[in-house]
């Protein structure tokens, strides 16, 4: 009679523990890449997930068996209406206390933005006075950030009016004075996704995944299901032993919340940026979303989240070597599927 092997591979990753619900629907960007392109540029943008389709394009990645040939690529459409730059914030750095805010300057938002739905205490501002106060502290500044508000009313698939706020780092150069001058120029104005990204660029996608509620260990951790025979009369979709409650290790797989987690997916390529949403809207519209009516971004592959969910796109923080050598190249798309997604 054969003996069971003494070790099995660990099921599931402890790197994502605790597996709890995300604290906020619009994720906060925790890390920013160091970008040097010779001019200031915002390093992130917010959009709303519309849905998926597929395209045919010429594979321009070097060293691939399909290089130079037409390939099938699944894509995700993210609708990205222009964002209003509501405020500029400066951060200083202290070795003992870390990063701290030096102050901020707010611009008066237009009435159609309805920013008071998000910030109920919003009042009137003396923007020039606040900017002058920031300039006096510019010698202590390490980071320049923009507080930008989305315009969900311009998105075709959304019915909400409350804008979402996102803090965006301004990068591209190391001179803080140039970064601050750029922030002053865009304060109170709109920025488009074309001002942040370009076609062919790699971005990181940060979003909250689709929620699945309370699930067992098989679905939540991927543990192996036990054989269904008489010696496993207590169940098969469970772990073999957990011990009693007081001495259970935290690494032990247990049932609980699954999904609705904040996740980051790296190096998603932008295949297209366009203002005509009908180029990518399938017949009958995207399921649970509708028609794309404003500027959109087409990303290769899948991304986290459900339709209508806020998606944060950030400059790639760890791009591959081939991308660093060849740079940004515009993809050659030969076909976009507009077939209906009903019943798929």
Curated annotation (Swiss-Prot):
Any one Pfam family match given in the protein's UniProt record, by short name: Ribosomal_L3
Subunit structure, interactors included: Part of the 50S ribosomal subunit. Forms a cluster with proteins L14 and L24e.
Gene Ontology CC terms: cytosolic large ribosomal subunit
GO terms for biological process, alphabetical: translation
Function: One of the primary rRNA binding proteins, it binds directly near the 3'-end of the 23S rRNA, where it nucleates assembly of the 50S subunit.
Keyword Ribosomal protein: yes
InterPro entries assigned: L3_arc_euk (IPR045077), Ribosomal_L3_dom_3_arc_sf (IPR044892), Ribosomal_uL3 (IPR000597), Ribosomal_uL3_arc (IPR019928), Ribosomal_uL3_CS (IPR019926), Transl_B-barrel_sf (IPR009000)
Keywords: Ribonucleoprotein, Ribosomal protein, RNA-binding, rRNA-binding
Family matches, as NCBIfam families: L3_arch, PRK04231.1
Keyword Ribosomal protein assigned: yes
Stated name of the protein: Large ribosomal subunit protein uL3
GO terms of molecular function: rRNA binding; structural constituent of ribosome
Family: Belongs to the universal ribosomal protein uL3 family.
């Amino acid at each position: 009679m054969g003996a069971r092997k003494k070790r099995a591979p660990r099921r599931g990753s402890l790197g994502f523990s605790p597996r709890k619900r995300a604290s906020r629907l619009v994720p906060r960007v925790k890390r920013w890449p160091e970008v040097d392109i010779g001019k200031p540029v915002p390093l992130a943008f917010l959009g709303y997930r519309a849905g998926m389709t597929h395209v045919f394009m010429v594979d321009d990645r070097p060293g691939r068996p399909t290089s130079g040939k037409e390939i099938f690529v699944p894509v995700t459409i993210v609708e990205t209406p222009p964002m209003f730059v509501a405020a500029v914030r400066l951060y200083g750095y202290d070795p003992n206390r870390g990063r701290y805010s030096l102050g901020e300057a707010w611009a008066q938002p237009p009435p159609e933005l309805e920013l008071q739905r998000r910030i109920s205490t919003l009042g009137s501002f003396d923007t020039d006075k606040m900017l002058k106060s920031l300039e006096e502290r510019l010698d202590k500044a390490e980071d320049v950030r923009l507080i930008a508000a989305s315009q969900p009313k311009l998105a075709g698939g959304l019915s909400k009016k409350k804008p979402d706020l996102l803090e965006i780092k301004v990068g591209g150069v190391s001179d803080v004075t140039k970064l601050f001058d750029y922030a002053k120029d865009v304060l109170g104005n709109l920025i488009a996704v074309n001002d942040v990204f370009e076609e062919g660029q790699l971005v990181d996608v940060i979003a909250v995944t689709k929620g699945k509620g309370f699930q067992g260990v098989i679905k939540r951790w991927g543990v192996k299901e036990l054989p269904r025979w008489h010696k496993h009369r207590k169940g098969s979709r469970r772990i073999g032993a957990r011990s009693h409650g007081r001495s259970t290790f935290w690494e032990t797989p247990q049932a609980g919340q699954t999904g609705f987690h904040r996740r980051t997916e790296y190096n998603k390529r932008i295949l297209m940026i366009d203002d005509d949403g009908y180029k990518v809207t399938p017949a009958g519209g995207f399921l649970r979303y509708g028609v794309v009516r404003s500027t959109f971004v087409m990303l290769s592959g899948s991304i986290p989240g459900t339709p209508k969910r806020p998606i944060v796109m950030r400059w790639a923080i760890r791009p591959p070597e081939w991308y660093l050598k060849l740079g940004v190249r515009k993809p050659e798309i030969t076909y976009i599927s507009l077939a209906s997604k009903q019943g798929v």
